[in-house]
Each structure stands twice: as structure tokens, then as C-alpha cells.
Amino acid sequence: MKEERAQQIAEQWLTHAAESAGQNDLKLHMGMISKRVSVQGVPGFDNIDYDTWYTQCRHQFENAMIKSIAYKGLNLISETETQINFTVYETVVGSDGTLNEQIVEMSLEKEDDDVWRLVQERVLIENDAMRNHELS
């Protein structure tokens, strides 16, 4: 896969993830997440799997807890025909005004139904973030 195409797929995925969360659309949002997802680096959790993510999103969406999610500075790490790895700066604004900003490393995978889904996410600690991500 060409780098430009991988960049486009990742950007489209991020746009749809932010829009579905902003619209509190649980079905659409979770349709973008692999049943095999694994999230590391979230304080208080060793690992977040699909069921935990679903439960958290359902609670947040039903209670309209997220005002917006935005991404910027996508930095492509690697790409193949079926996987795209990148880092991106994520900003989550809560409906109560709380602000959470972090750099995350994400892996998207083209699953058997030809849909690109998130299979892995890692919240980077500051040293990792500075080494692996250049904010544009």
C-alpha cells in the first residue's frame, strides 16, 4: 500500500471515530472497533478489551458526557495492505468542560469483511510520545 493511501485511510477513520463519538452513536462508533481490540496505557487499567470499551462508551454516550473528540498531527509509522500503524494527538472535551489531551499510537487492521477497525491503541507516556511523534 502506498503511504498516501494509508494516510488517507487513517485520516478517514479518525474523522469517523470523532464524528460518531460526538453524535453519541454507539453502534457506528463500536463498528469501528475490532472485537480483538487491546488498549494499554490508560491509568487504572492494565488492558481495555472490546467489552470494557463498549460498556464505557455506552455509559458516556447515554449520559452525553463527550462534547467533542479531535485529532491532529497524524504521523504514519508503518503500513501494509492490511495494517496501518500511526501516532496522533487526541483531544477529548467532556460536556462538563474537562479536557484530556494525549498522544496515542493506533493500529488499524483491515478485517475479513474489508472494514478497517482499531485493533490496538496505546496511550504514550511523555518520553515515548516525544520520541515517536512529531506534532505538525
Give the location of each predicted region.
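A solvent-exposed, acidic/Ser-Thr-rich amphipathic alpha-helical stretch
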Residues: 26-31, 35-75
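Short, cysteine-centered beta-strand-loop-beta hairpins and adjacent loop/turn segments enriched
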Residues: 63-65, 92-100
